[in-house]
Every structure is written in C-alpha cells, then in structure tokens.
Amino acid sequence: MFSQAQFNVTMAEEDRWKQWYPNMEMIVNNKGPKLIFPELNFNITGLEEKSRYVVLLSIEKYDNIRYGYRNGKWGPSKVRHATKKEQEIKYFLHPDGTKLGKELMKETIKFDTVRITNHKKFMDKDNVFFVETMHKYVPVLTVKNITNVESANHSMRMEVAQFFPVTVYNQESIGNWKSKFHKNSTYGNRLDGGNKRKNTDSSEERTSKRSKNETEIAVSDILQVASQSENYNESTNSGRLQNEISSSIHQFPSTSYQNQYPHAYPTVNTPPIYVQQFTALFDEIHNQFDPKTKQNRVAKNVQYLSSVPQFAINQKENIHQNAPDYPVSQFPNQYPYGSYPYYYPYFQSSQQFPHLNYSMNNSIYSDSSFQSSFSAENSYFDENGNPIHYPYYSSN
C-alpha cells in the first residue's frame, strides 16, 4: 500500500495549460459536444506495481461562484449569482479498463476523447460532461485500487487545468493560440464566425432588465447567429440560409443585423424569425412536442411565442397570451394575429421568397391541413387576418 503523499498526478500538457492559468476558456454551443483542448492527459506515480487499478475522470465545479468578464478580466459577477442546486458528479471510466500499477506509471493516461456541452440533450454519451457557462470547472482524476478493495480511492483536482466554458472566446488570443495546435479550435473566435454576444457582466445587466417572458425566451448561450451559406449571392440576395439562429433573438429587429444580412429580412416591419429557427428554439428550451411525430409543433410554438410581446412589434394588444392547441388549419380564424405573423413563408417559397429557398420536402410543416391554410400567392396575414404580401427588404 502507499500513502497519499506518495501518490501524485501531473498534467502531460501542463506547459500549455499554464500559459492561460487560471483563465483558460473552452467553447461550448448548441451544435454538439466540444473536445477539451489542451487535452486531459495525465502521468501518475506512487502506485503499487502489482495491484490493478481503474482510472476515472470527472469535470467538477471549481467553486459556487457565477463569473463575469468585465474590463478585460474574469471575476465574480456583480449582477447574477450561481444557482444553489448541487452539481451531480459524473465519472468517466478510462476506456482501457483495469491495468497494473506498473503499466499505468509507464504510460501517459489519455482522456483525449472527453467532451463538454452546455446542452443536456447531448448527455447520452459517457464521455460527455455537462457544464454551465460563466462558471469555473476543474478536471478531477480518481484512481481506485481494485486488487486491495480496502485501499482508499485517490482523487486529485488538477488546479492548473481549471477553465471557463464560454460560447465565444472573451480573450480572442486564446482562440488564436489554440488554432496553432488544434484545427477545430477557431470556431469561438468572433472573427471566425463565432457568436458575437459577449459573456460580460454588462450583457447580464441588460438581461436582468427584461421582462420575465422575454428572459425565458432569451436564454443565454442557446442559439447562434443566422449566417449566410456559401451559395449566397450578394448581388441578388438569393441563396439558401443555413438552419441557424441568433442568440440575440430578443433584440430584433436590429439595424446593424439588417445591414449585415439584408437577405434575411423580407421587410423591415416584419418580425425577423424563420420557421426552422422556431424548431431549434423549442427543441432546445421547451421540448413541448414529440420529435418523432412532430405533433402539435405549430400549436405549441405559437403558444409560447404569443407570450413574448416584442415579437409583435406594435401589436401588443392583439397578442394571445395562451393560444390553445387548436388544429393548425383553424389558426387564421381563431388567432389571426396570434399565430401566422410569427412565421415566414414556406409554401411555394422558392417562387415568392427565393432568398429563403425553403421547399415542401425540407419543411417541418408539411401536413396537408397546415398547407391548405396558405395560398401560393399570399404568405402573410395582417392584424385582421387578411392575407397580404410584403416586399423584400433590401440594403440598396
């Protein structure tokens, strides 16, 4: 047996971690779990050579503080506080399983497949850890002697590897530095297509001033900026949009956004939301429908979005706060302004709105009852429920 003083763990990539200690940042977003870089590779000493061990990794909160990035520095947030809910610790068993102590001490123990996410829907895999943005985390290595079951487990917090999960690098130099060693590390740079929303105390301050309903929809870090695809033609404002969304959905309409993405706006006065964007939003936040059958998708979406007054522009008095689950074909009569004004056209939109380029085949709303409520010539409804057709918005 060995004492705790004999047992020691060091990071194989310690020099890289030290370059940004204690303010390393890791990108997380809604596109899927992200690899941790620098990698979590360890060297262990002080084991019994003939005993067999298992090695486990956990990603745990460093403390119970909610942080903010302000004036170029990380520090405790002055606006929002961490939740009191205790973290559920998850352990990931090293894929090699059990090994002799002498084997473990000769090699570098690599956890290079470990990923992190800020979306619980990706938590079905053993190597994926859930983290919250604006909190600090630290990897913890646990070594268990299974030959001598009475031997105590040995755990060590790797202080040098503490990090902040973020949706975009606050310290852009981190992204530039990572890109030199890891080809997939540039996503979070603002200049490389990353989310333009800063994780700052000042942004939290703006969020805290919103109404309750607005805050529920404008959940931080759940969405990403709608961007044009490689097929976008600037001269004609045409081309397929990627199925992405904006994290600043509560700030629309935005003059700067219109100038940057003129093809994204059929008209200045129309709520700038896309049909497929609604899908991702409610998939992620409310989960109010069966993703396989897609039943009640439209009704549920309308029910939630009808409670958000800023989307209606100057028609707040016409918003229906609790739209029930009526069949979709009844919406024009039952809720002339509480439903369709939030949806952009998809029915024969290749002729009407070529810059959206949605088709019947890829539309989530393809059931006949919903299609029948639209016409090929009119794709929008005014406050009285009358179908109208708005002109395109152009930057010219």
From Swiss-Prot:
The keyword Transcription applies. Residues 11-192 bind DNA. SMART domains: TBOX. Residues 185-215 are annotated as: Disordered. Residues 193-215 have a biased composition (Basic and acidic residues). One of its GO terms (cellular component) is chromatin. Keywords: DNA-binding, Nucleus, Transcription, Transcription regulation. One of its GO terms (molecular function) is RNA polymerase II cis-regulatory region sequence-specific DNA binding. It is found in: Nucleus. GO terms for biological process: cell fate specification; positive regulation of DNA-templated transcription; regulation of transcription by RNA polymerase II. The keyword Transcription applies. CDD domains: T-box (cd00182). This is Putative T-box protein 39. It comes from Caenorhabditis elegans. The lineage of its organism: Eukaryota, Metazoa, Ecdysozoa, Nematoda, Chromadorea.
